[in-house]
């Protein structure tokens, strides 16, 4: 069982969190906080609008989370190079501890695979290599680095989770996305993306949940 820690995007706020859990995205899109509003717009398929919300939020350029989400929104809007630029910017932005710093280089590696662009792929892999230490596997999303580098096996990567249902929804959605990215067999990859996209509720807080839906819409499989 993973240590009861998690790199939190935002401590749950009762009303928006309840709207998110209930899938009431039209209402959530009217929330004042840009994180909740942007997530709702992502769920509603209004990707360009979501990107603008994340990018224009106060302090967005210093927030790894906002830049990662902005990149996902740009990616889903078909602006892949702009998305990669947002993820590159996220490399130097603020993160919650060493585990939180894993996501931006992982997303850059993903961009390198899908665009494809070997520069992004190699840079993402190199940065993950610098970050990876076995103890990082105790706090999500730390295990993502080890998994993408071949240091963590798929079964424990998918199965070693949290008791808290919200944390586990977020972790499992992310884990299935990265398993799909790494999987060589297109049908198995698609199954992982389906698992990631199907998890509801708190999973919407995770970039990977939205990118998995994009994979299914676009059939962007190797």
Residues covered by each model-derived region:
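Residue-level recognition of tetratricopeptide repeat
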Residues: 17, 39, 72, 109-113, ...
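Alpha-helical adaptor scaffolds
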Residues: 35-43, 129-168
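Alpha-helical junction/boundary sensor with strong preference for TPR arrays
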Residues: 32, 61, 94, 131-135, ...
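Structural motif corresponding to the intra-repeat A-B loop/turn of tetratricopeptide repeats
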Residues: 22, 44, 77, 115-118, ...
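Alpha-helical segment of the N-proximal tetratricopeptide repeat
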Residues: 10-27, 33-41, 175-182
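Alpha-helical repeat scaffolds
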Residues: 26-30, 49-57, 82-91, 118-132, ...
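Structural signature of alpha-solenoid helical repeat junctions
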Residues: 36, 62, 100-102, 107, ...
């Amino acid at each position: 069982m993973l240590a009861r820690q998690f790199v939190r995007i935002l401590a749950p706020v009762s009303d928006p969190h309840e709207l998110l859990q209930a899938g009431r995205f039209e209402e959530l899109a009217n929330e004042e906080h840009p994180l909740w509003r942007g997530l709702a717009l992502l769920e509603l398929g209004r990707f360009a609008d979501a990107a603008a919300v994340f990018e224009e939020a106060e302090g967005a350029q210093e927030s790894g989370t906002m830049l990662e989400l902005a990149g996902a929104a740009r990616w889903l809007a078909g602006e892949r190079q702009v998305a990669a630029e947002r993820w590159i910017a996220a490399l130097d932005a603020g993160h919650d501890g060493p585990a939180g710093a894993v996501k931006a280089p992982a997303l850059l590696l993903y961009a390198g695979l899908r665009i494809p662009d070997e520069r992004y792929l190699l840079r993402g892999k190199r940065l993950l290599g610098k970050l990876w230490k076995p103890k990082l596997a105790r706090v999500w999303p730390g295990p993502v680095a080890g998994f993408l580098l071949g240091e963590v096996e798929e079964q424990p990567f998918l199965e070693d989770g949290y008791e808290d249902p919200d944390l586990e929804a977020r972790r499992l959605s992310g884990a299935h996305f990265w398993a799909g990215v790494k999987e060589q067999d297109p049908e198995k990859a698609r199954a992982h993306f389906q698992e990631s996209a199907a998890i509801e509720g708190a999973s919407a807080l995770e970039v990977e949940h939205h990118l998995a839906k994009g994979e299914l819409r676009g059939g962007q499989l190797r």
